[in-house]
Amino acid sequence: MAKQPGYQARSTNSGKGELKSRLLFVLGALIVYRIGSFIPVPGIDAAVLAQLVEQQKGTIIDMFNMFSGGALSRASILALGIMPYISASIVIQLLATVSPALAELKKEGAAGQRKISKYTRYATVVFATIQAVAISTGLPNMLSGLVPNVGFSFYFTSVVSLVTGTMFLMWLGEQITERGIGNGISILVFGGIVAGLPSAILQTIEQARQGQMHPLVLLLIAAIVFAVTYFVVFVERGQRRIRVEYAKRQQGRQILGGHSTHLPLKVNMANVMPAIFASSIILFPATLTQWFGQNDKFEWLNNLSMLLNPGQPLYLLVYAVAIIFFSFFYTAMQYNPRDTADNLKKSGAFIPGIRPGEQTSRYIDKVMTRLTLIGGLYVTFVCLVPYIMTSAWDVKFYFGGTSLLIVVVVIMDFIVQVQSHLMSSQYESALKKANLKGFGQ
């Protein structure tokens, strides 16, 4: 009995030790990611490429560079970022809704998920190869001196380097999910965006200092950033609580049940994924048209890429529709109203005024549909903020919308994950303490 306090302390410390190791792993992975973004692709003049990216400010290439954490402007092997993997994941998930074979794999549990993950990796290689070929063939035509020695050797090494970099990031993201905290892919996207924040802030302040931007405009931008951040936090914490009651039942001489609780449904159940998915889906064809369009034979692609530049009406329309679509798609992939209704029925719970079973499922689905529409419109509104700002004040993408939403939501999710790990370790410690007391008695 005297050993119980010491045992509890060791249990708590072991739980905190695991959390510490997971946090250190995430930090280490982000450091590796950052170091990798400085490893150059052979054959490209990085200084000339940085000049080119600066000239492309406000275009799809600028946005592509933002998501890669500036790796594109440094001609890094990680220039493609994690976007090819995200695009591949979207395609495989979409195919799973129409392909009976993939649909069956989803029902096979862990074994089926491993096969789907394998197909996603294969698709990632395909998407990364297509984008790498587009970049390697488009770069020599964009600026003189960018690629000093154009030839098969350059094309081969650049494509292999870029595809290898993407596959490494895919593996790193999976390791963060498994051995770290949170969703590894979201954290890598977050890391890429945050890496460019300091330079973007300093650049904007420098614009104001040199008189290119009125100080009041700078203050207004800061106020908008804080207002959007507050709005994002407010909505992300918002819930629609459905009242649930438990029927009274007799077990021996005891009356169990008879109490009520709530079924919480988030306003934005899809989280930040619609914004990431929509950006990935637009970036893939838009960058292809941008790179391939540098060839005189495909000049029409260059004209199309101009229409797909951020802030253009076509881009805004496609982006808004994609966000709404992926809000419904991702919510449907992650949450099943029928399963929730069945679980309530099995536990003896019901929604007042709604019959258990099919009617409960339809009611939850109706509520989720309304919430998803509200969540999709909210994400669309937040993501369109930067384009209004850039067109009015020539501010970089980092200051609003997609990037701000991703940063805030990933931080919030990360904090929740850390808290759940702490609560889990405390819960395990309490259980072990109770078991020791029972053993002592």
Swiss-Prot record:
GO terms for cellular component: cell envelope Sec protein transport complex; plasma membrane. The chain crosses the membrane at residues 24-44, 77-97, 123-143, 152-172, 181-201, 215-235, 272-292, 313-333, 373-393, 397-417. Keywords: Cell inner membrane, Cell membrane, Membrane, Protein transport, Translocation, Transmembrane, Transmembrane helix, Transport. Pfam families: SecY. The central subunit of the protein translocation channel SecYEG. Consists of two halves formed by TMs 1-5 and 6-10. These two domains form a lateral gate at the front which open onto the bilayer between TMs 2 and 7, and are clamped together by SecE at the back. The channel is closed by both a pore ring composed of hydrophobic SecY resides and a short helix (helix 2A) on the extracellular side of the membrane which forms a plug. The plug probably moves laterally to allow the channel to open. The ring and the pore may move independently. Component of the Sec protein translocase complex. Heterotrimer consisting of SecY, SecE and SecG subunits. The heterotrimers can form oligomers, although 1 heterotrimer is thought to be able to translocate proteins. Interacts with the ribosome. Interacts with SecDF, and other proteins may be involved. Interacts with SecA. This is Protein translocase subunit SecY. It comes from Haemophilus influenzae (strain ATCC 51907 / DSM 11121 / KW20 / Rd).
